[in-house]
A protein has these predicted regions:
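Catalytic core of DAGKc-family lipid kinases
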Residues: 87-215
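Glycine-rich beta-strand-to-loop/alpha-helix junction loops that act as flexible
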Residues: 16, 72-74, 98
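ATP/NTP phosphate-donor binding region
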Residues: 1-69, 79, 115-118
């Protein structure tokens, strides 16, 4: 295995439920390798939605030394971690994709093989800077949230929300037909959807109005 950097503590944030529970099995294999090679690490396994954000906030608040945080999970887990990071120039993110879609991994051309991803993190000689987006929402109280892949409202968000709790997703994943699950749920939600009127503001000045809006989506990565 590639030599890791001596004296560096690696903080792993893991979603064990990612990819229909495969995330936990992959993490145990990674952990065995870490123990075998004497890597200093701390592991934080999520148990509910939003906990990855809490872990990231806890790890990056008031940090005075370099922090290497490695995310083991899907796009949703990575989004939560990015949203939770407190402004700190000392934080470096690593990513081992274990998601159903892994759009971020495809966009960044990262390997889907966990051990290869671990080696890439340990032998990295340079740090890549990537963009993230920020959405503002709320009526009485304005809230902000970061995202690293995409953010949407309307039909696409409805499909994603139903996908999280749909039995169709798990069934299709087991038989390697992930795209089919999106098509089925997408078609169902399309039949239920009702377009609305609205507008977008470009660069804070130019207002563009639309009469039939099914969804609005902002993309950071080329894959979704």
């Amino acid at each position: 295995m590639a030599k890791y950097e001596d004296g560096v503590m690696y903080y792993f944030i893991i979603n064990p439920a990612s990819q229909s529970g495969r995330g936990y099995k992959i993490w145990k294999k990674i952990e065995q390798r870490l123990v075998r090679d004497g890597v200093e690490y701390q592991a934080y396994l999520t148990e509910y939605a939003g906990q990855a954000t809490e872990y990231a906030r806890k790890l990056t608040s008031h940090c005075k030394e370099a922090r290497v945080i490695v995310v083991v999970g899907g796009d949703g887990t990575m989004n939560e971690v990015v949203d939770g990071i407190v402004s700190c120039d000392m934080v470096t993110l690593g990513y081992i994709p274990v998601g159903t879609g892994s759009d971020l991994a495809r966009g960044l051309r990262l390997s889907r093989r966990p051990m290869r991803g671990l080696r890439r993190i340990f032998k990295a000689r340079r740090i890549r800077q990537i963009d993230y987006g920020v959405i503002a929402y709320g009526d009485d109280v304005l809230r902000h949230r970061r995202f690293i892949v995409s953010a949407g409202i309307g039909l696409d968000a409805e499909v994603c929300q139903h996908m999280q709790r749909s039995a169709i997703k798990n069934i299709c994943n087991r038989i390697h037909l992930r795209r089919l699950s999106y098509r089925i749920l997408g078609f169902i939600q399309y039949l239920k959807a009702k377009p609305i009127r609205g507008y977008i503001l470009l660069d804070g000045t130019r207002r563009v109005e639309f009469n039939y809006i099914y969804f609005i989506s902002a993309q950071i990565q080329p894959c979704e």
